[in-house]
Amino acid sequence: DITTTEIDDAFSVELLAENRVRVGVHIAAPALGIVRGDAVDAIARARLSTVYMPGDKITMLPTEVVAAFTLPEGGLRPALSLYIIVDRGTQEIVATETHAELVYVKSNLRHNTLDACVTEEALASGSGDYPHKDEIAILWPLAQALFEKRQAARAGYGLRREVPGNTDYNFYVEGEHVTITPRRRGSPLDLIVAELAILANSTWGAMLHDHGVPWIYRTQRTLAAAG
């Protein structure tokens, strides 16, 4: 939302011939500017993670480093990019490639301003007017296809289907005034961001596995209450 300072992912869309599209998943890469054992590395190792709290946070990296590597509108920043070639008729991925590169960020899209108009109904009918409407319309069916593919894989492992739609909350603190607004998890923009990030993680995880390189995933598992 509007309070986000660590903008760590961006997407690009390029139309190709034969009803194909090239989608880029660009992940901020501050590690490219950190040397093992240097001062920034020591701070990151001590903090381990960004700490979130209502209306505030303590970032894992110093503010100056965040500013240098976040992906702001109008900024040219280093990123690790996954490019996928997608058949738009089937939503199948026919090729992938990975690059460490500089990317120019044209726009920052905010959930708090777009979730209300980028709805399932608006995407189905083509209604509404919002930034990058055509690109979002291309990414939406891809995200749905990626989600369904993951659910089929979960079923193969005997796991239950994921049910998106939980409500999250944003906190805005201005002096002594606190505003709490609901945010629905599983909205189209939320699903697009989640599925493309998961795709990048799984693709790069498989690549590292193939080359015998260790890879650590962060998980957010909900534990059932004992009773």
Predicted regions and their residues:
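Electropositive polyanion-binding surfaces
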Residues: 1-227
